[in-house]
Amino acid sequence: MKFILYVLASLVLFGLSVLLSLYSSANVYSATVMISQSPVHITIGLNVCLCLFFAIANALKTLLFGSLQTFELELLYEQFWITLTEIMLAITVFREAISISFFMLLSTLMFARVFHSICSFRTERLQIQLTDQRFHIFSRLTCAYFVLSILDASLIYLCFTSEHLGDKSTRMLFVCEFSVLLLNLTIEASKLCIYLYEARHLDQVWDEKSTYLFRLEVCRDGLRLLAYSLLFMYQFPYVSVPIYSIRQMYTCFYSLFRRIREHARFRQATRDMNAMYPTATEEQLTNSDRTCTICREEMFHPDHPPENTDEMEPLPRGLDMTPKRLPCGHILHFHCLRNWLERQQTCPICRRSVIGNQSSPTGIPASPNVRATQIATQVPNPQNTPTTTAVPGITNSSNQGDPQASTFNGVPNANSSGFAAHTQDLSSVIPRRIALRDGWTMLPIPGTRRIPTYSQSTSTTNPSATPTTGDPSNSTYGGPQTFPNSGNNPNFNRGIAGIVPPGWRLVSSNTQSLSTNSAMTSLYQNASSADNNLGSSLPNVVPLSRGLTQSNETSNTFPAASSNISSQLRELHTKIDELRETVSNFRADYNSIRTSLNQLEAASGINERIQTTSADSLLNSNGMSGTEGFENTQTSITTNDNQSSILTSSDQTSPFATDEDRQNSRNVQLETVDENF
């Protein structure tokens, strides 16, 4: 309504200016001369021409497209700034050729771009379902393609033949632009034909549609790049720096490169989808949401179809609705996943890449498999060699083809340690020289050195040899290595470092230890035959019920490390005996002082209160595995009217215990020792 009022006001103002010129002039010729020479009359005339141009364009838009929707207006507004930048560059380059004809061609080019953009929006948005409601839209869109193609061809011919529109360089600019618009219109019409063909064959799925669409887009970008390259070569003799052509060439080249790269990633992600994305089991579907995130339909395993199949609509031919599991653990339909991968090669839920073993993006919560990956990355693969053995810890041996199909304690896709596991995440980090039996896995021991390196020059007869840090090639990463007491037997290294590396422990899903488990003891037969003393050096094995809590257990150490620990324990026991003797002396002195105070108070009859507080306990009886400790003891001596009383309070146990209370084993653990005491 506002635009109509603006057009009417412009026409009325232009009519008044013409009447005023005729009234003040003797004849029509003099009135025409006055209008052409007066700046006010020229401005009013240009305003009327612009209003008429906008009115014609608006009428053509209403005729071809009808009313625009909100999202179309937003997209046009976004493209307006790009078009405005290109116009400014064109005016800067061709500032000498600026004229009324130049502005008319430039305005026509702007509106032609708007119409072509609307056609592109409608084509991409159009769902080719030829019902009675959509047939009118489809016919109007076809008419718009026909009218715009005639308009583009006419303007190209006009710019080629009409010399009064400007010099050759300016006309070639508009020829190139209208040719690119005609090319875009042809590509969009071809895509519309592809959509129409797909709509005519709804009873089957056309998987090759994405390939044809990609070829059309590549042809579009390639021909655009060729057109602007020819324009650059033609304008170079006339324009010193053809900035406009350079920008268009860069845009086309980047679009072509990005499209080819995305298609290559799509081909990589969909090369063998049945092998890359295993079929989700019925148990995994039960433990997760059965609704597909893309189509919002319920997913079913092929072996467990829905019960009410008669009420459901028949699926088109070739439509694969098999639930596929991504590396991140999310499940989607096969067909929905393929359509999604055409646009993005990431999970639609967590945005994790589906190509390769890539980590989660920053700021996005990790999937359950990431926890298992973080644990497994602490174990190096000694030789980084592929293996065909089962993944350690998979509890369901019948699903070796799909390592993710097992569960443990209600956790989907979990190994025996309770963490979710994935073959691609664990195969390159966990040492897999030997296969672990079902119900066993390896967990790291926090706070321990893993995979220590022993020097080549270490004597095999020296039991106190200490581990040294050397070249990784001389460690259990795969290089040669000499261990204490190994002799010349080659099975020693394989028995220790080849099965369970130092700093790790075996964890079982039952309460049976390694020494009584015949299934796991067979793994160490070769190692046990290498050395008679090897049985005492077997890795630390704990049940699963204690595996996650015993983080401070002693790790699998070599004889040299065991010797150092024994010497440290002997020194610790010596210090404990010295502390006990000091405590005994302190107790005797304390008793003598207390007796003297009682005698002094009874003799002198002085009313005073003496309050003494003993020192804090030196050792905590709970932390010393049977060794008593001092508790907070407070003694109050109160004397009132020649009467004294001694109040002694203790938390649990008096520090002055008898010898029987102090009897305990040598298995102690020192947590805190005050050396200044």
Swiss-Prot record:
Q: Which UniProt keywords apply?
A: Endoplasmic reticulum, Membrane, Metal-binding, Phosphoprotein, Transferase, Transmembrane, Transmembrane helix, Ubl conjugation pathway, Zinc, Zinc-finger
UniProt similarity note: Belongs to the HRD1 family.
Reaction(s) this enzyme catalyzes, per UniProt = S-ubiquitinyl-[E2 ubiquitin-conjugating enzyme]-L-cysteine + [acceptor protein]-L-lysine = [E2 ubiquitin-conjugating enzyme]-L-cysteine + N(6)-ubiquitinyl-[acceptor protein]-L-lysine
Q: What's the Enzyme Commission number for this chain?
A: 2.3.2.27
Q: Where are the zinc fingers (RING-type)?
A: 292-351
The biological process GO terms on file are: ERAD pathway; proteasome-mediated ubiquitin-dependent protein catabolic process; protein ubiquitination
Residue ranges, Lumenal side = 24-39, 108-140, 193-225
> Species name for this entry?
Schizosaccharomyces pombe (strain 972 / ATCC 24843)
Main location per the UniProt record? endoplasmic reticulum
For side Cytoplasmic, which residue ranges?
A: 1-2, 61-86, 162-171, 247-677
Q: What is this protein called?
A: ERAD-associated E3 ubiquitin-protein ligase hrd1
Q: In which pathway does it act?
A: Protein modification; protein ubiquitination
The subcellular location is:
Endoplasmic reticulum membrane
Topology relative to the membrane: Multi-pass membrane protein
- Which Gene Ontology terms of cellular component type are present? cell cortex; endomembrane system; Hrd1p ubiquitin ligase complex
Q: Where are the transmembrane segments?
A: 3-23, 40-60, 87-107, 141-161, 172-192, 226-246
PANTHER family with a match to the protein in the record: E3 UBIQUITIN-PROTEIN LIGASE SYNOVIOLIN (PTHR22763:SF184), RING ZINC FINGER PROTEIN (PTHR22763)
